[in-house]
């Protein structure tokens, strides 16, 4: 058979096959209509740009966009939830420049001025402001009469009021601070306070008497004592330091060092003192108890930008609260803001009011009912 004839035969067979009637598509027994919203299109337009998928699987470029976005989202939320402990680390760092915990009592004997960088300070009252460390066991704090103060833990959780609105009712008294997990003996004769963290901050104010701060300051120096419970019979001497006019800072950073401050407190304090979701959020960006915080270059870039966006977001929340519940008056053009939306726990119907929490710790110091 000639070559031309062979080619014609082959072409004829191909044409015959193509012209044959196709069998009906097989009807599978388990065929199910997939509802809208479950099956993902192969291409999706989002604020991240175009996301591409094959049978629901993201391609490499899409995968990179999504994980970068996830890391950034988590970092911004981690920043907003980390404002409270970072503020406390900065507070403690500034006070430790004056002297060590447990033995140093800074006092603004002639009030505070602009040389000392603090959040929401008053310049018309003498403050006593100090830090306690419970790692070596229970501490006793003898509080003077006629003070108004509080004790907050390292997460800025309220622990107790002190003085006029505390259990001593302004008469002064002995407060026994117990460290996390303490199971030892608790003697009588104290206002017993259980803290969830090892580091704790106490601040109180005295008041002017006939325009004079000295009587209140003198009472603080006369009656204030801090000592381990084991040394109750022979308390060590305290170092009272006048810090009025002192140039020092107690406000936390808003850039990359924010994360280093946050890591410091996560490493120091018991995991039981924070909820697992918050700890999980911080762990997702590399801050986890017992592990080094050492982000690679891409993650460090994300964290640096997230800190800037987090700070900007906190400013927006604080300065331009967007719902009426944050104002004394219904008109949101009003500048009269409420300090505690959701009360001192920043909660409403059992849920954390996130903006109230973050906004408060951006601008303020001290939590008390």
Question: What kind of region is each of these model predictions?
Answer:
Residues 1, 24-25:
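Extreme N-terminus of proteins, especially the signal/transit-peptide cleavage junction
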């Amino acid at each position: 058979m000639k070559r031309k004839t062979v080619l014609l035969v082959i072409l004829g067979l191909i044409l015959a096959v193509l012209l044959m009637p196709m069998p009906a598509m097989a009807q599978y027994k388990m065929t199910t209509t997939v509802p809208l919203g479950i099956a993902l299109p192969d291409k999706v337009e989002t604020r991240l740009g175009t996301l591409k998928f094959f049978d629901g699987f993201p391609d490499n470029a899409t995968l990179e966009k999504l994980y970068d976005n996830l890391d950034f989202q988590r970092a911004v939320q981690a920043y907003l939830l980390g404002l409270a402990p970072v503020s406390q680390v900065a507070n403690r760092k500034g006070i430790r420049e004056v002297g060590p915990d447990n033995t140093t009592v800074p006092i603004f004997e002639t009030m505070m001025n602009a040389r000392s960088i603090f959040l929401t300070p008053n310049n018309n009252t003498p403050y006593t402001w100090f830090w306690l460390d419970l790692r070596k066991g229970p501490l006793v704090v003898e509080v003077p009469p006629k003070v108004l103060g509080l004790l907050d833990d390292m997460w800025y959780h309220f622990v107790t009021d002190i003085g006029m609105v505390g259990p001593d009712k302004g008469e002064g008294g002995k407060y026994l601070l117990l460290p996390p997990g303490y199971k030892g003996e608790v003697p009588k004769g104290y206002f017993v306070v259980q803290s969830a963290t090892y580091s704790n901050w106490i601040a109180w104010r005295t008041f002017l008497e006939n325009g004079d701060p000295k009587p209140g300051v003198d009472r603080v120096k006369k009656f204030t004592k801090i000592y381990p419970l084991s040394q109750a019979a022979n308390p060590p001497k305290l170092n009272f330091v006048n810090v009025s006019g002192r140039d020092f800072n107690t406000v936390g950073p808003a850039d990359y060092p924010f994360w280093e401050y946050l890591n410091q407190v996560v490493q120091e304090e018991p995991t039981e003192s924070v909820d697992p979701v918050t700890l999980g959020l911080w762990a997702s960006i590399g801050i986890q108890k017992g592990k080094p915080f050492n982000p690679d270059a891409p993650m460090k870039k994300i964290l640096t930008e997230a800190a800037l966006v987090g700070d900007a977001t906190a400013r927006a929340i604080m300065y331009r609260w967007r719902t009426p519940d944050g104002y004394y008056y219904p008109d949101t053009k009003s500048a009269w803001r409420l300090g505690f939306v959701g009360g001192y726990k920043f909660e409403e119907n059992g849920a954390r009011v996130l903006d109230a929490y973050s906004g408060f710790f951006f601008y303020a110091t001290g939590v008390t009912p």
